[in-house]
Amino acid sequence: ILVLAAGVGFGVYHHKSNETKFNDDYINGNTAGNLYNAGIFCTAADGTIYFANPSDSSKLYSMNSDGSDLTKISDDVATFINADDNYIYYVRNNPVFTEPFSFLTINTDSLCRLDRSKHKKSILLDSSASLYASLVGNKVYYLHYDDKDFTTFYEVGIDGADSHQVDKTPYRPCSVVGQYIYFNGVSNDHNIWRFDTVTDTSELVLKGNYYMPAVIGDTIFFLDNENNYT
């Protein structure tokens, strides 16, 4: 029975992996400004806006840039929304009890993927509590929580494969340009660093006491901790 179950599980995963539509380049799923503020809005490349609708308990909606074609696409409460040409990625932030008489809570703060064209049931990329999800090409970088290491820096493929810890320090991957993630130090320093998602290496960009870097074009914006966060 165990062998059969394992075989079925592999078949489901293999089928899901084969169905995934991968990106051809290092597309980024949202802007730093949005992701630092819970990512409740996201504009896809075609102009479609995905957002947590405050008029419907922050459920996931879409609309055109002119406000037309308002559509509810999921009953999930959505945060840290990202989008590419094929999928919406978001952190499900559902209340503990979502249905009358419910006594079980499953995957209420999980990392999810939803097909933009079909709007079918979301696929779980990580069932653990997640935050600050950010799409980089064919991977999602985010903060993952578990009872062993608590909150750490993680990555997972957009097909749900190869979920693993990148660093034990909970760096927030909000500012992304192509294959690079810009972040500030958390424990040993507060410098601004650049993480290369191809080589899994980091290099120093700016030494100082800084917070929440956001790269736009050739300019890095940040808060200066020693000058009243200006």
Place the predicted regions along the sequence by residue:
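Hydrophobic membrane-insertion alpha-helices, especially the h-region
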Residues: 1-10
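N-terminal, intrinsically disordered, polar/charged segments of Gram-positive cell-envelope systems
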Residues: 14-72
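Residue position within the beta-strands of beta-propeller blades
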Residues: 50-52, 89-92, 141-144, 182-184, ...
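A structural motif specific to WD40 beta-propellers
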Residues: 70-71, 122, 163-164, 203
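Post-signal peptide N-terminal segment of secreted/secretory-pathway proteins
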Residues: 57-61, 70, 75-85, 89-103
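Repeated scaffold domains used in trafficking and secretory/extracellular systems
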Residues: 36-44, 75-85, 127-137, 168-178, ...
